[in-house]
Amino acid sequence: MALNTEKNTYTLLFAVGLVVIVGTLLAAIDSSLKDKIRINKILEKQQNILYAIGINENEGNSVNFIAADKAEKEFNKYITKQIYIQGDQVIEDDKAYLIDVKKQKALAKDPSHKRKLPLFIAEKDGRNLYVAPIRGKGLWDAIWAYVSVDEDMIIRGIYFDHKAETPGLGANIKQRFFMDDFIGESLLDS
C-alpha cells in the first residue's frame, strides 16, 4: 500500500513528525551543552571584572578580553577577596561572582528578600581596587557594567555591555573610547 501524499493527513503527520524529531534534537543539544554554557558565562563574568581593573589584551581602540583559558587563573591572581552585602551584613564568599545581579534585582521587589550585592576587591600595582557590578535600563533593554574604583573613589576602569541597544549611539557603550572616558573621574564629584 502506497502512501497518498496528496491528503492533508499526510501533510499533518509529516509536520508533526518533523517537529518531534527536530524538537528532540534541540533538547538533546541544549542539555548536552548546559555545563559548557554555564562555564562560559562564569568565564565571561571573570573577563569583564578583569577588564574593569585593566587586565586585558587591548590593541588600538578595540576591547579585547584576556583569553578565556587564562581568565580563571588571572581572576584568582588579582581578585584577593570577594564579598557580598546582604541587608546590613557583609559576607565573605569566594564564589560571589556566581551571584546573578539581574535575578537579585528582580527578587528585591519582594520586601522580605534581602538581595545580595557582590563586591570584588582586587590588588593591582600595589593598590586596592573595588569592583562593583551595575545594572540598569537602556533605551531598548538592559545595560550592565563592572566599575572599579580605588580608595579615593576614583574610577580606574569600567566595562559596559548591553543586550539590545541601537547600532548607532547606544551600541557605542561597548567601544573602548566610551569606557576610557570614565577613567580618572571621581565618584564624589558633584
Give the role of each language-model region.
Residues 2-190:
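Flexible, solvent-exposed loop/hinge segments and secondary-structure transition points
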